[in-house]
Amino acid sequence: MFKMYSTDLQTNITEETKEYKKGNWINMVSPSDEEIKTVCENIGIQEDFIRYALDSEEKARIDIEEDDNTILFIIDTPIIEIESGAKVYSTMPIGIIFVRDDYI
């Protein structure tokens, strides 16, 4: 699933949008292959960057694609999981992709 958001800079109100435009935030959670393809075609990036960002085994890193001016940040975010009734502290990667003026 993915949703796009746009913020009106005059009112500072963020709303969901269906239009691909400069400055949008694109939030992707477990997107289908078709959704990944659609987003990549509309904003002009490689599918690999989104797939890296969605990989639960990715390590924290920064990757720069100079051909299309895209930057991928993978950060490890702390989470608490319950295993056998006990709290276990772990990390989960979150991917942030900067594409010119779009963020995924």
Listing of model-derived features with the role each one plays in the protein:
Residues 1-104:
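Peripheral, non-transmembrane regulatory/ligand-interaction domains of membrane transport proteins
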